[in-house]
C-alpha cells in the first residue's frame, strides 16, 4: 500500500498516502463514531496498490522490503516508507526504527516511558526533527516527542545523516529526521488500525479524506491510546510502564493547482502518564513515590508554494508554523512545569539557472518563549532559568547546486543568523555526490551546527532520581562540526543485486551541554555545565541487502560507535552509549502476496554506566506475521522475544526518598517478552 508522489518542496507537489488505526477505550469509541459520521459522504477513488512492485520515481527506488533508497539525492538519505513501517506494529515514531541499523531507540528512564533516539552515537537532541520540511518537536517537546507521532499517520520518514541543507536552519548536527504525514489529496475513503498487546495497551487510529473538487481536499486524522495496567513484572515495587492516556487529532486541507500549492494543518494533542510505586507495594510506613506527566500541545502550520509561469523550475515558498506546548511534571516531591511557545516563518526563492545550476535563497525567523517553574528538594538552589525567557533568531541563507547529469553533484550552502541571546553566527555546509560508474556512488559532507541548550526542558526524565540538580547559570550555545563519507555499491549477482553501503562520520564539539552524573560536585548530583575539554564521536557502519530467493530479502548491518566527552578533566566514554550494534532482518512475502513474515534480530553492544562501570551486551528478537485481505489485513507479532531485561532497572527502589534512588540508568529493556495483535482496515469506496 505504498503510494508516492513528489514531496512538497517549494518546487513540487507533495505526496499522497494511505493510513492505519487502533483502540478500545470509551473516549476512542466516541472518536471513531465522530469520524465515521464525518466521512459518510466520501466519494470512491481508485488507488493502485504497489506494495509488491518496484518503481522508479525521479531517482527514488521504492522497494517493499527496504523502504525507499535515494538514488540521486546529494545527501546520505534513507526514506522509510509505509511498506517498511508495516513490518512491525509501529504504534508511534519511537517504534519505527526497530529494523533500521542507523537509529537507536531506548527508554530515557524506568518511570515515565519516555523514549530517546541516538544517531551517530549521540543523543537525539542533536538530530533536527522536521515535520514536512519544517523544524518541529524542539525544546520542551523533545523528551516525549517520539510518542507524539502516531505510526499510522506517517506516510514516510526521511533519515538524513551528517550535515543537512542550510534551508532547514542551523540546528542539525548529526542529521535530520523528517516526518511526512498522510496527505488529503491522495485518496478518498477511510482507513483505520486497531491494536492490543499483552500489556493491555489499546490503540485506535482512523483517518478519512474528501476531495471537494479537483483542487481542494481535506482530511481528518484521529488517534487514541490507553494503558491502565498496574504491572510490576520484576517485583521491585515500581510499575514497569506508566498508565497512559493520549488523544491526538489533526485536520488538514490542501489546495493544489498548476501554479499554486497551499497546505494547512491544525493539530491537538493531550498526553497523561502516571507511574511510580505500584499500589500493592505502597508501604504504610513510607509515603508513596509518584510520577505524573501531563502534557497538552497545539500546532498549526501553513505551507504555500507559487510556481512562476514561464520560468520552469522557479518558485517562491512561504512556510509558517506555530506551536504551544504545556507540560507539568511530578517526580516524588520534585515539581517542574514548562510552557513553550514557538513561532517559525521561512520565505524561500528557488530557481534553475539552467540544466546544471540551481540557486536557492531565503530568510527565516524563529522565536521561542519559555516559562519554567522548578521546585523541590532536588534543586540545590533556584533553577537559574526559572521564570520566563525568550530567544529570537533571524537568518538568511544561500545554497547553490551544480549537477552534471547523474555523475556529479556539488552543493555548497551558507547561512548567517543572529540570536538575541548569542549574537551572530555563520553556518557553512558542503555536500558532494560522485558516481564514477553506475554501480558505485560516493558521498561526502561537512558542516557546522548550533543549538540553544535548555537543561531541564530537554532532559526532564533525568529528574526521576534522588540526585540534587545543579544547573550552571552561564550555559553557552552548543556548536559542533560534522564530517562524513559514504559509499553505496549495487553489485549485480546473476539476476539479483547485492546492495552494500559503508559510511563513516565524525562529530567534534566546540561547546556542548555536558550532563555530569555524580561527578566533582559530589555523589548523587546531576550537574548541567558547559564543555571543559574535548567531546567527539566516531561512527562506522556497514550494511548489505540481498534478495536470497524470490520474495525473501535479508539485510545485515554492523555499526561501531566511539563517543567520548570530558568529565571533570577526564576524557571518558559517554555513558549509556553502546560500543557496537549488529542487525539482521529477514522479510518474506509469498508469491500470492497474501502472507508476509518479518523477523529482526539485534545485538546491542556493551557500554558504560554513570560510574564508568560496564553493562553487558544483549540480544533482542522481534517477529511479525501479516495476512492480507481485500479491504483489511491482520497482523500478529512479538517484541523482545528473547525475554531479556535489566534485572534491576531502578536503583534504590526499596526507598525512593533517599539520594541513591535512580530510575535513569536504562541501558536495555525494562519489560520482558510482549505479544500483540492488530488489524488494518481500508475502505476507499463508501
Residue map of PLM features:
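Extracytoplasmic beta-strand/coil segments of soluble accessory domains associated
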Residues: 98-135
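A beta-strand signature from Gram-negative outer-membrane beta-barrel systems
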Residues: 148-189
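Short acidic/polar hinge/loop motifs at secondary-structure boundaries
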Residues: 134-161, 249, 472
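Flexible loop and strand-edge segments within Gram-negative outer membrane beta-barrel domains
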Residues: 227-248, 254-316, 322-340
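C-terminal beta-signal and adjacent terminal beta-strands/loops
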Residues: 554, 606, 627-686
Amino acid at each position: 500500500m505504498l503510494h508516492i508522489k513528489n514531496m512538497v518542496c517549494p518546487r513540487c507537489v507533495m505526496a499522497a498516502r494511505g493510513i492505519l488505526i487502533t483502540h478500545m477505550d470509551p473516549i476512542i469509541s466516541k472518536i471513531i463514531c465522530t469520524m465515521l459520521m464525518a466521512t459518510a459522504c466520501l466519494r470512491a477513488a481508485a488507488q493502485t496498490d504497489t506494495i509488491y512492485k518496484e518503481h522508479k520515481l525521479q531517482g527514488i527506488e521504492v522497494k517493499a522490503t527496504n523502504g525507499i533508497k535515494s538514488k540521486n539525492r546529494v545527501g546520505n538519505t534513507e526514506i522509510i516508507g509505509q511498506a517498511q513501517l508495516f513490518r512491525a506494529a509501529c504504534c508511534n515514531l519511537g517504534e519505527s526504527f526497530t529494523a533500521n541499523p542507523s537509529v537507536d531507540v531506548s527508554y530515557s528512564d524506568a518511570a515515565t516511558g519516555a523514549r530517546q533516539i541516538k544517531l551517530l552515537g549521540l543523543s537525539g537532541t542533536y538530530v533536527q526533527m522536521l515535520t514536512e520540511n519544517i523544524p518541529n518537536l524542539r525544546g520542551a517537546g523533545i523528551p516525549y516527542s517520539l510518542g507524539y507521532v502516531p505510526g499510522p499517520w506517517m506516510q514516510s520518514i526521511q533519515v538524513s545523516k551528517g550535515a543537512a541543507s542550510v534551508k532547514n536552519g542551523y540546528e542539525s548536527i548529526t542529521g535530520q529526521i523528517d516526518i511526512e504525514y498522510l496527505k488529503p489529496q491522495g485518496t478518498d475513503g477511510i482507513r483505520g488500525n486497531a491494536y492490543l498487546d499483552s500489556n493491555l495497551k489499546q490503540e485506535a487510529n482512523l483517518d478519512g479524506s474528501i476531495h471537494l473538487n479537483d483542487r481542494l481536499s481535506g482530511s481528518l486524522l484521529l488517534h487514541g491510546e490507553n494503558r491502565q495496567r498496574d504491572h510490576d513484572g520484576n517485583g521491585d515495587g515500581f510499575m514497569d510502564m506508566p498508565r497512559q492516556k493520549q488523544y491526538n487529532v489533526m485536520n488538514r486541507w490542501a489546495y493544489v493547482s498548476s501554479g499554486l500549492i497551499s497546505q494547512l494543518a491544525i493539530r491537538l494533542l493531550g498526553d497523561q502518564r502516571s507511574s511510580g510505586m505500584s499500589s500493592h507495594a505502597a508501604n504504610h510506613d513510607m509515603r508513596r513515590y509518584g510520577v505524573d506527566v501531563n502534557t497538552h500541545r497545539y500546532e498549526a502550520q501553513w505551507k504555500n508554494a507559487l510556481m512562476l509561469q514561464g520560468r520552469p523550475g522557479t518558485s517562491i515558498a512561504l512556510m509558517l508554523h506555530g506551536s504551544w506546548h504545556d507540560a507539568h511534571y511530578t517526580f516524588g516531591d520534585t515539581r517542574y512545569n514548562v510552557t513553550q511557545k514557538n513561532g517559525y516563518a521561512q520565505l524561500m526563492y528557488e530557481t534553475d539557472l539552467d540544466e546544471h545550476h540551481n540557486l536557492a535563497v531565503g530568510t527565516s525567523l524563529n522565536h521561542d518563549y519559555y516559562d519554567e517553574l522548578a521546585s523541590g528538594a532536588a534543586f540545590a538552589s533556584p533553577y537559574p532559568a526559572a521564570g520566563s525567557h525568550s530567544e529570537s533568531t533571524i537568518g538568511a541563507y544561500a545554497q547553490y547546486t551544480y549537477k552534471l547529469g547523474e555523475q556529479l553533484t556539488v552543493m555548497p550552502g551558507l547561512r548567517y543568523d543572529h540570536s538575541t541571546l548569542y549574537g551572530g553566527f555563520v553556518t557553512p555546509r558542503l555536500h558532494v555526490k560522485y558516481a564514477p560508474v553506475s554501480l558505485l556512488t560516493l558521498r561526502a559532507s561537512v558542516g557546522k551546527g548550533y543549538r540553544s541548550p535548555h537543561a531541564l526542558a530537554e532532559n526532564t526524565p533525568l529528574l526521576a532520581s534522588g540526585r540534587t540538580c545543579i544547573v550552571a547559570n552561564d550555559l553557552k550555545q552548543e556548536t559542533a562540526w560534522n564530517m562524513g563519507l559514504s559509499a553505496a555499491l549495487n553489485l549485480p549477482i546473476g539476476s539479483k543485486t547485492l546492495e552494500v553501503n559503508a559510511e563513516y562520520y565524525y562529530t567534534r564539539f566546540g561547546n556542548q551541554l555536558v550532563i555530569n552524573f555524580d561527578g566533582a560536585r559530589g555523589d548523587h548530583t546531576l550537574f548541567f555545565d558547559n564543555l571543559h575539554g574535548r567531546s567527539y564521536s566516531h561512527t562506522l557502519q556497514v550494511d548489505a541487502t540481498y534478495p536470497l530467493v524470490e520474495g525473501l530479502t535479508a539485510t545485515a548491518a554492523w555499526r561501531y560507535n566511539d563517543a567520548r566527552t570530558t568529565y571533570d578533566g577526564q576524557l571518558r566514554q559517554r555513558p549509556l552509549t553502546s560500543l557496537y550494534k549488529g542487525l539482521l532482518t529477514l522479510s518474506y512475502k509469498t508469491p500470492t502476496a497474501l502472507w508476509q513474515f518479518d523477523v529482526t534480530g539485534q545485538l546491542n553492544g556493551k557500554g558504560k554506566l554513570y560510574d564508568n562501570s560496564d553493562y553487558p551486551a544483549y540480544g533482542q528478537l522481534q517477529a511479525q506475521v501479516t495476512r492480507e485481505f481485500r479491504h483489511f489485513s491482520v497482523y500478529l507479532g512479538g517484541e523482545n522475544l528473547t525475554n531479556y531485561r535489566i534485572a534491576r532497572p531502578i536503583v534504590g527502589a526499596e526507598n525512593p526518598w533517599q539520594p541513591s534512588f535512580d530510575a535513569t540508568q536504562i541501558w536495555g529493556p525494562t519489560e520482558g517478552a510482549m505479544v500483540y495483535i492488530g488489524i488494518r482496515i481500508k475502505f476507499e469506496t463508501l
